[in-house]
Curated annotation (Swiss-Prot):
Name this protein carries in UniProt: Large ribosomal subunit protein bL34
Record flagged with keyword ATP-binding: no
Gene of this entry: rpmH
Record organism: Methylobacterium radiotolerans (strain ATCC 27329 / DSM 1819 / JCM 2831 / NBRC 15690 / NCIMB 10815 / 0-1)
KW Ribosomal protein (keyword) present: yes
One GO CC term, this protein: ribonucleoprotein complex
Superkingdom, taxonomy of origin: Bacteria
Gene Ontology MF annotations: structural constituent of ribosome
HAMAP family assigned to the protein according to its UniProt record, in alphabetical order: Ribosomal_bL34
Keywords, ordered alphabetically: Ribonucleoprotein, Ribosomal protein
């Protein structure tokens, strides 16, 4: 059985990156919550 996590920088950016978050209302809420919490890194 292969491992479930097969790292890829491109897929990581496309699925969890800043622009992917900003593309949906829910994603924008995620960014807003992380900003409010004072996160150093907002997205992948």
């Amino acid at each position: 059985m292969k491992r479930t996590y097969q790292p890829s920088k491109l897929v990581r950016k496309r699925r969890h990156g800043f622009r992917a978050r900003m593309a949906t209302a829910g994603g924008r809420k995620v960014i807003a919550r992380r900003r409010a919490h004072g996160r150093k890194r907002l997205s992948a």
